[in-house]
């Protein structure tokens, strides 16, 4: 567990290359370490290596199909690649597992909004806020969606 803690500390300090070395060492010894797979994927995503990060999320999901972090983060990477329907499928899968996942609701709202479905997106932002009232992404996005709907 020390290497995972060390990798986390490196990420917090913005030293992603060193964090990736830690994850590689963990995965060399334990290729099925779900935490290391998801955290490595997240680190790669933070570095803008989206397609590679998605591959690591998929490895983690093969081992643990109900991993909420892997599902929502994979959805986020797909969203960044503008693959909104694929992203929404990830969020829907996460919501089947955890009906109170504010992040999945908010992120689904973002993907819907990018598809021009502001009215539907607004419902998801409101749901995210009903679960987590101080959720910044949902609040900001809700306000933007409302403004867009007023301008139509």
What positions do the PLM features span?
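Register position in tetratricopeptide repeats
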Residues: 12-13, 46-47, 80, 114, ...
């Amino acid at each position: 567990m020390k290497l995972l803690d060390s990798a986390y500390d490196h990420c917090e300090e913005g030293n992603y290359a060193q964090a990736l070395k830690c994850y590689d060492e963990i995965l060399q010894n334990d290729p099925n370490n779900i935490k290391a797979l998801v955290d490595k994927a997240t680190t790669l995503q933070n570095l803008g290596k989206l397609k590679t990060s998605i591959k690591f999320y998929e490895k983690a999901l093969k081992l643990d199909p109900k991993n909420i972090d892997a599902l929502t983060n994979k959805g986020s990477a797909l969203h960044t690649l503008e693959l909104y329907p694929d992203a929404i499928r990830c969020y829907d899968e996460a919501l089947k597992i955890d009906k109170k996942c504010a992040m999945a609701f908010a992120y689904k709202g973002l993907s819907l909004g990018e598809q021009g479905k502001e009215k539907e997106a607004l419902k998801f932002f409101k749901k995210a806020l009903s679960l987590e009232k101080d959720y910044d992404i949902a609040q900001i996005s809700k306000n933007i969606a409302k403004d867009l709907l007023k301008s139509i």
